[in-house]
Amino acid sequence: MKTFVAKPAAVKRDWYVVDAEGKTLGRIATEIASRLRGKHKAEYTPHVDTGDYIIVINAEKVRVTGNKAAGKIYYRHSEFPGGLKSISFEKLIDRKPEMVIELAVKGMLPRGPLGRAMYRKLKVYAGVEHNHSAQQPQVLDI
């Protein structure tokens, strides 16, 4: 018996909508990352992008446990001396609520070209409205 290897052209990708309202950030991010990689499919192949498209709505209503809302800090660096910037979860969720879920999921995907291709299939929206109704996404309950 030979090992099955998925062909990139033969992969069937579905569209799913995930409602993040009231969900814990890490728990929803792990399930989204797993779906983007395609690990829920029988034809999963590590070196082929077999994942589905995921639309996340209500990103502004995602929650974190404990006192991570004030204590969780996101860092970035401008590559210039003294260019370290930081922002707390509370401020980031007020300014760019989509970025919280995007950063959590991006950290769970592989680095490199394959991971970037998987990340491009993630669509995050702060509110209820999204512009992907033409793809007829299915509701994914996490």
Swiss-Prot record:
Q: Give an example GO biological process.
A: translation
Q: Return the Pfam families for the record.
A: Ribosomal_L13
Please name the GO terms that the record assigns under molecular function.
mRNA binding; structural constituent of ribosome
Xref: CDD domains:
Ribosomal_L13
**GO cellular component labels:** cytosolic large ribosomal subunit
Q: Which domain of life is it from?
A: Bacteria
Tell me where the transmembrane regions lie. Answer: none
What keywords were assigned to this record? Ribonucleoprotein, Ribosomal protein
PROSITE patterns on file: RIBOSOMAL_L13 (PS00783)
**Oligomer status and interactors:** Part of the 50S ribosomal subunit.
**UniProt xrefs under NCBIfam families:** rplM_bact (TIGR01066)
Q: Would you tell me the protein name for this molecule? A: Large ribosomal subunit protein uL13
- Say which species the protein is native to: Aliivibrio salmonicida (strain LFI1238) (Vibrio salmonicida (strain LFI1238))
Q: Which gene encodes it?
A: rplM
